[in-house]
Structure formats: structure tokens, C-alpha cells
Amino acid sequence: MMKHTLLPFFLIISSLLVPSPGYAAQQNKEWFERENVFGGQVYLRTAGNPDRPAVVMVHGLGDEASTCWEDILHRLKKDYFVFTFDLPGFGRSTKGNALYSPVNYARLIHQLAEKHVGKPFHLIGHSMGGAISLQFTHSYPADVKTLTLIDAAGILHRLAYTKYLAPLGVDKVLDQYNVLNERKVTDLAGALMSALEKRAPINMDLLINLEPFRSKVLRSDPTSIAGLALVQNDFSRIPETIHQPTLIIWGDQDKIAPLRTGYVLESLLPDARLELLPNGGHIAFIEQPQRFHELLRPHLKQSYKAKQKPASKPESSNFRQTVQCQNQSGHTITGRIGSLLIDGCQNVLIKDAEINNLVITNSTVTMRNSRIISMATALKLHDSNLNITAGHIEGEVAIEANNSRLDIAGTQLVGSQAAVKAPMDSTLIFSLGRIDSPLYDDIVIHGMKVVAPGAYL
């Protein structure tokens, strides 16, 4: 009688001790294993059900490493199999005098994901991790279902990138996560490389591959090595090869990775959409986790295609024959314009504009997501500084620069006679640009050009 009475009780207890199918499938674990790209131990972590769609997350510079993903990991692990790790040189992984480059990191991630994920995955990268993720998607496109880039660092040419941080005081950026390490990117690219290049032309790609250089000059510091390798990596031909749906998320107050990089990537990637987090810094995904998650979730579900490229003409605006800015500061100009004349103006922003011809004199101007198309010379500059992002300039001569400095990113120059002429010496820094002229047949251009009188591009 006692046996029959106790049987239901034991059955209930036994049922409670047997894990549910969902629980049994969870693989929340942390471990170390040997890797053969850098020759050390790598810290790995998984969360969630491996039968679910997979998400791989790549962190940026700094010993915080993969701990930056804590909130996102917990939000995703119910519906996704999440795989994270500390990149070698950071966090709990081995630190040594190795070449911590985007290409080598991509090789490592491919090996790890092949072993522990085993199927195409959604790839998310922040800061340097965004640059690594871009390199990875280019190198191993079959592995990636969607790409998410968060405040990606180091994509622009190093001269444009270092110039962005140079004017900022330490006090203005120290309150941002990981900034001390992120600043080393610019310290190295600016101070070290400029100093060396002034002495003699050097091949920095060759030097950074040498163990004695990394040991003596970079003191075997992983952050210094990774930072220098990042700004040396040439991303100029990569964006056009990325066909995965790409979500680009940026804090609009980021003082570490210039927001213009986001506009450039949105312009150049075939299927990309840029979302800004208002008042967000370099780690807006930590500062605004709910808003970040609201953007990320639909992207991972692929419930929409990334935003299409804008129409060739801006939506706004009635056509204005002539617009002038004279001796003003902080002026914003947009819309469809015949002739735009800017003289003695500072901090002018031209955005989402279509212009027939533009003349800038004694001014500082930023131009974004705009086109200048002319039957003659499209853009003339005299004694001015011009920053162009995600643009198109076309004419008999695209740009005529006189004693001016131009920083041109993600922009195509088309000139039936010349892309650039300079009656007076002018300096142009190109990042992920294109030139189509009698001298250059629609080529990618990435680097600095000094154009002297009589010379042209």
C-alpha cells in the first residue's frame, strides 16, 4: 500500500529533475582554447540554443573586450545562439607581440566560427570590431547572413582619421568608454608615422610585420599594434563587395570614430542603412540599450531590405538659381541650386544638395550627401578648406583648387578633361574615393595627393 501511495510522488519529483528540451539545448558556457593564428589561448563564450540562428559579436580595442556585449547577449540568447570571444591581445586572451591586424583577426574568427558555430551567422562589430567585421565579410562572404556595424573605426584613410581627433582636447573625450586606448590609434598613426615619414619614405606595412619593430618601437603593446595595423589596413575596395544587408548604427556625438564614416559606408555599401542614436557617443549601444535593440531586432530577422539609395535629386526644395553666403558662420545650405557662391564664411554645411556649380573663397565648408554636376568646372576653391563626404562631382573639370586643402571621403570625381586641376599648390586627402578622368579610368583612390600648377588628376 505504501508503494502505491509514494509512486505518484516519485513520478512528480522525477519529472521536475528532467531538463526541458529548451533548457537542455542551452549552451551557456565559457572556456579557453588554443588558436593557431596568433599562437595563444583565446577566451570564448556561448549563450543560447545552437539550433537557433547564430549571432557572432566582435568587440573593439581595450581590455574590457567582450564584456561590452553583456546586455546584448542577454537580450538575444533566448532567440539566438550567441558566440563571443576576447580577441587575442585583449581581455582574458593571450597578449603578445603578434600582428593584430584586421586580416589576421578575420582568419581567426573564421576558424573559430567554423568550429563552434558551423553555419552562416549574423555578424555584429563595434569600433575596431566593426572594421574587422567589414574585413571578415569581404574575405568570407558565405559565412555572413547580415552585417551590423557600430561606430566602426579606422575605415577612412589614416590621414583623415587622425585629423578628426587631433584638435580635440583630452578632457573632451576621456569620459567616453575606452578612449585612452582608442586614442592610441591616432597617436600612432599621427605622431609615429608622420615622424618616420618625414625622415624618409617608409613602408609601414613591411615594418609592422617585423617582430623587432613591434618590440622596440611599439613595445609589444597589443593596443598599439592593433591600432597601427587598423589604420594601415586598406578598406578602399571592400565596401562595394559587401552585398549582405547591412545596418550601420552611430552615436551622433561620437568623438572617437567620425560620423562621416557612417555616411560613407551607407553610400558605398550596396545594401546598407544608417541609423543615428541621438546624443549617443562611441558606445551608444551601451548608453541606449533599448533603442539599439529596437534597431537590431528587425535587422536580424531580415524583415525588411536595407534602405535603398536616395533618388538622384533631393526631395525638398524648389530650384534656386543663385545662392550666396558672405561673411557668415554656421550656415546650412540644402536643396537644388544653380550657382552657389561662398565667400568669407566659416563652418558652412552643404547637405542633401544638387548644385550646378560651386565657388568657395576664403571659407571653411563641409559638404555631405550632395552632387555637383556642371558642363564646365563644377567646383572652384580659393584659399579654403573643404570636407566632402559621400558626394559626386562631375564636369569638364570636377575640381579646380587654388591654395586649398580638401578632405574627400566616399566621393566620385568625374572630369572629361581632368578630375582635379590646381593653378596653385593644393592638398587632397582621399578616403575610399573614385576618379574617372583621361588620366584615371574610374579607379579607386585612397591617400594623399598634392597637386601643383601644371599637374592634374
Regions found by a protein language model. Give the residues of each.
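Flexible "cap/lid" loop of the alpha/beta hydrolase fold
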Residues: 138, 147-187
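Alpha/beta-hydrolase fold catalytic core
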Residues: 2-56, 77-81, 119, 154, ...
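Catalytic histidine-centered segment of alpha/beta-hydrolase-like enzymes
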Residues: 280-293
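Active-site loop/oxyanion-hole signature of alpha/beta-hydrolase fold enzymes
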Residues: 84-124
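Hydrophobic, aromatic-rich cap/lid helix
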Residues: 208-235
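Conserved HGGG/HGGXW glycine-rich cap/lid loop of the alpha/beta-hydrolase fold
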Residues: 47-92
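Glycine-rich beta-solenoid repeat tracts in large extracellular/virion proteins
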Residues: 322-324, 338-343, 356-362, 375-382, ...
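Short beta-strand/loop motif that positions the catalytic acidic residue
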Residues: 242, 248-250, 254
